[in-house]
């Protein structure tokens, strides 16, 4: 039988504007999945409050809903308009227009939920990706190349890459020493950085960027979009995103995304990272033909987080984490490159973030350490102008 090719196309319309009239399966056979327990005071807006014609997945936060859209996009190799009408690009209300693909998606979510409830006690063991693997048509027949060919290389980003209970303390000690040592890091309390941001929402063109960071865990990123700034804030407790590329004028982060914002803020002042997790595992991985030591942190209420350290230099290469959603886990990969000395601290000048909704690159050009930053920089951002 002819096999349909697996789709690996760029998805420039994904992150900010994917909206399905499917919604959360809260009303279907009782979803069971762990939500993060990160402290939070701001109530996130739910998908059915923000969007029209949400029939399933009701009651889940907007940021989780967008992660669900990312799961669909990654699993099928789809862009927004593969399921939604083309008029939805630039017109959010049109995402609610019914299409055959939306009806199929609702049925598939119900089917997968039934399998997980009946066979796995509600755990998200079967997901869209389990069958589709990047193709819109699942393959039924076995692939003989997999049976008789050379086994594929282990996935360095797999959750199960870390199998040892060995303490990660030597890895973190070497890392902290490699970036300046604990004494210098203790005196590194803030920075203001400028540079460029490149992503799907900029049309892959670099635009100006500002970062304000304060120890131990406050961070604001401002992307200077042509029409209006895109702002991401974590104030130490709450997190928000506001920008012209977003589906809602202001998104309050929740659960795994809130924890991810906290972790991102802490990575600039990493002496407390090891204490952030309840348990640790360790392992090894190969990335681009180079060996890395892996420390996997496990925090109650969250999926594991993998930290990849260069065995020779001790520097951190990658952080891999997963957001649990109503339809299963979605990955987020952050790669760190171009370490440079700034006042005795080895800082990352290039950060590449890859997730199911897109890919972005931050290139820093200047970092000013230990400068005063007014508290207002970490306040809840002003909502963006509503899109039509």
Predicted features along the sequence, with ranges:
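Acidic/charged, solvent-exposed loop-and-adjacent secondary-structure segments enriched in E/D, K/R, S/T
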Residues: 241-267
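Gly/Gly-Pro-rich "capping" loops immediately C-terminal to redox-active cysteine motifs
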Residues: 59, 88-114, 140-154
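Mature N-terminal segment immediately following signal peptide/propeptide cleavage
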Residues: 44-85, 168-195
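Bacterial N-terminal signal peptides
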Residues: 12-30
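N-terminal cleavable signal peptides for secretion/export
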Residues: 58, 149-208, 383-388
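The canonical Cys-X-X-Cys-His
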Residues: 77-87, 125-136
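Gly/Pro-enriched, hydrophobic low-complexity segments
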Residues: 224-228, 288-385
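N-terminal mature ectodomain segment of secretory-pathway/periplasmic proteins
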Residues: 176-247, 275-283
């Amino acid at each position: 039988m002819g096999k349909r090719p697996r789709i690996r196309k760029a998805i420039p319309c994904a992150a900010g504007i994917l909206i399905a009239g499917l919604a959360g399966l809260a009303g279907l056979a009782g979803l069971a999945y762990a939500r993060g327990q990160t402290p939070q005071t701001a109530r996130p807006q739910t998908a059915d409050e923000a969007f029209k014609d949400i029939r399933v997945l009701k009651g889940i936060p907007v940021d989780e809903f967008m992660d669900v859209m990312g799961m669909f996009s990654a699993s099928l190799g789809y862009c927004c308009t593969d399921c939604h009408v083309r008029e939805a690009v630039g017109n959010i209300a049109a995402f609610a227009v019914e299409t055959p693909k939306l009806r199929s998606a609702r049925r598939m979510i119900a089917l997968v939920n039934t399998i997980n409830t009946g066979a796995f006690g509600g755990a998200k063991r079967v997901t869209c990706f389990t069958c589709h693997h990047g193709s819109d048509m699942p393959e039924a027949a076995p692939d003989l190349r997999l049976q008789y060919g050379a086994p594929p290389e282990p996935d360095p980003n797999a959750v199960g890459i870390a199998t040892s209970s060995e303490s990660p303390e030597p890895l973190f000690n070497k890392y902290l020493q490699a970036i300046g040592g604990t004494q210098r890091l203790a005196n590194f309390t803030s920075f203001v950085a400028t540079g460029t941001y490149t992503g799907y929402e900029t049309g892959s063109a670099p635009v100006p960027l500002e970062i304000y960071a304060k120890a131990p865990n406050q961070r604001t990123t401002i992307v200077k979009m042509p029409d209006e700034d895109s702002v991401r804030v974590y104030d130490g407790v709450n997190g928000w995103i506001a920008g012209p590329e977003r589906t809602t004028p202001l998104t309050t982060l929740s659960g795994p995304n809130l924890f991810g914002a906290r972790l991102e803020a802490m990575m600039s002042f990493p002496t407390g990272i090891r204490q952030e997790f309840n348990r640790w595992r360790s392992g090894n991985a190969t990335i681009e033909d180079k060996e890395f030591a892996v420390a996997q942190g496990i925090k109650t209420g969250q999926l594991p987080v993998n930290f990849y350290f260069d065995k020779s230099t001790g520097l951190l290469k990658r952080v891999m984490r997963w957001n649990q959603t109503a339809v299963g886990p979605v990955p987020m990969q952050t790669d760190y490159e171009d370490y440079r000395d700034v006042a005795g601290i080895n800082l990352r000048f290039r950060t590449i973030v890859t997730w199911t909704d897109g890919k972005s690159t931050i290139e820093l050009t200047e970092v000013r350490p230990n400068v005063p930053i007014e508290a207002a920089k970490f306040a809840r951002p002003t909502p963006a102008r509503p899109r039509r």
